[in-house]
Regions:
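Juxtamembrane extramembrane loops of integral membrane proteins
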Residues: 71-78, 158-219
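PDZ/PDZ-like peptide-tail recognition elements
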Residues: 122-155, 188-241, 247, 284-286, ...
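Internal alpha-helical transmembrane segments
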Residues: 64, 89-159
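Residue-level signature of transmembrane alpha-helical entry/exit and packing/kink sites
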Residues: 1-4, 8, 116-125, 132, ...
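Small-residue-rich helix-interface/hinge motifs
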Residues: 3-101, 401-423
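Conserved PDZ fold ligand-binding element
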Residues: 163-185, 246-269, 334
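Alpha-helical transmembrane signal-anchor/signal-peptide segments
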Residues: 30-35, 147-164, 169
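Functional transmembrane alpha-helices
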Residues: 103-119, 224-248, 256, 263-398, ...
Length: 431
């Protein structure tokens, strides 16, 4: 667990550091003096001054900072911008003046962030999120170049299902659902999760030819045996409901299910299926926890449920692709995560997602622990690849979230700069 915490810290630290490096490199390219570029935060361990910049290593190796001359300390109005009435702003903020004068003793005022053109400032601020997208792209190339991509190939079609009635067959590759491009298996899963009842106009490829069909999900009520857990990637316990059969039996979030009554889960025989087939009798479940096999006894409970059923699924098997396709698929991979984050933010505003659906640092550590434990049987390289996949998601997430037009975020600053472009002069800074 300690190792996984360290991995999570390094991951988040790398993502934040690359974000700040984006600001740094574009600021330098635009002639802005970077007062300090630091790795980590907290007390400074040591620093080296080179040119305008002091390069620092700080105590806590988590993230970094890029502090530019004139960024926050030198304002637009300090450099001669006008207030709303076109008059010079008169300032009696002596502490601010003293800070400004102290800085100008050591730096050329022309190198201040605030002294640069609005388009230079926009480029500098936008560079942080852009570098996050570039980091996500680099890791996507590593992943797809190593193990391939996961096209939305139909891996199962149940008899007498809506999918079977629509003519879908195993091996068909879905490319569009309701005019939404589908490049990956996970895109279908995301779409179905939030549009389960929608009729799907599907475009798919079969033997090199394109076809279209319509799948209308079937609403049905079910009586099924359940444990009160949610499963991720077929074997991982993603959550355990309070006071459920699983909770009472000692099953924990993060457990990896090895077998149920001696039956190992497969893509064709998934855990919910195995549990439901028990008929409510006590079953023996073997889970892997902290590298050890743990055997538990649990009795499923009968649950009334309802669902919209299509009768087909895609398991996300990886397929190797050419170098050119690797680059193209990597762009699409980053685009998928950007789109997913944007849609998720929209769902928060519409109430489809709540604050409890967000993950903070503790959630990241839990996820890393889960990813590592689940990947261990496949070897160290697959552990790394799964961590890289998590970096792709987190880096794209940070890039998008930083572009939101909110105070203290890059997006909030960019909003005022674009207003400046329209107005032809800076927005007055409120005291």
């Amino acid at each position: 667990m300690i190792l996984n915490i360290i991995i999570a810290i390094i991951m988040i630290g790398l993502i934040v550091l690359i974000h700040e490096f984006g600001h740094f490199i574009v600021a330098k390219a635009n002639g802005v003096a970077v007062v300090e570029f630091s790795i980590g935060f907290g007390p400074k361990l040591f620093g080296i001054k080179k040119g305008d910049t002091e390069y620092c290593l700080k105590l806590i190796p988590f993230g970094g900072a890029c502090i530019m001359l004139g960024d926050d300390m030198l304002t637009q109005s300090d450099d001669g911008s006008e207030d709303e009435n076109g008059e010079d702003e008169d300032s009696d903020d002596l502490p601010a003046k003293e800070r400004r004068e102290e800085l100008l003793k050591n730096y050329d005022a022309d190198k201040a962030f605030a002294a640069k053109t609005v388009w230079s400032r926009i480029a500098i601020i936008a560079a942080g999120p852009v570098f996050n997208f570039l980091l996500a792209f680099v890791f996507a190339v590593i992943i797809i170049g190593s193990v391939g991509t996961d096209p939305c190939t139909v891996d199962v079609v149940e008899d007498s299902s809506p999918a079977a009635a629509a003519g879908l067959q195993v091996g068909d590759e879905i490319t569009k659902i309701n005019n939404n491009g589908i490049a990956f298996s996970k895109e279908y899963a995301f779409y179905q999760a939030y549009h389960a009842s929608d009729t799907m106009n599907i475009t798919y490829k079969r033997d090199g030819q394109k076809y279209t069909t319509t799948v209308t999900p079937e609403y049905r009520k079910l009586s099924v045996y359940r444990l009160g857990i949610t499963i991720s990637d077929n074997t991982l316990v993603a959550s355990v409901s309070d006071n459920s059969a699983a909770s009472k039996a000692g099953i924990e979030k993060g457990d990896v299910i090895v077998s149920v009554d001696g039956v190992k889960p497969t893509d064709d025989n998934k855990i919910p299926q195995i549990i439901n087939n028990s008929g409510g009798k006590e079953i023996e479940m073997v889970v892997k926890r902290d590298g050890q096999d743990v055997t538990l006894k649990v009795t499923p409970t009968l649950v009334e449920s309802e669902e919209y059923y299509t009768g087909f699924d895609s398991y996300g098997y990886r397929v190797k692709v050419s170098p050119a396709q690797t680059i193209l698929c990597s762009f699409k991979e980053v685009g998928y995560w950007i789109e997913t984050v944007v849609k998720s933010v929209g769902m928060m505003f519409t109430g489809k997602l709540g604050i409890n659906d967000l993950s903070g640092p503790v959630g990241v550590v839990d996820s890393v622990n889960t990813v590592v434990e689940q990947s261990k049987p496949d070897g160290a390289w697959y552990v790394c690849l799964n961590i890289f996949q998590y970096i792709v998601m987190l880096s794209a997430n940070l890039g998008v979230m930083n572009l939101l037009p909110l105070p203290a975020l890059d997006g909030g600053r960019l909003l005022f700069m674009f207003i400046e472009v329209v107005r032809g002069k800076p927005v007055k800074k409120e005291r």
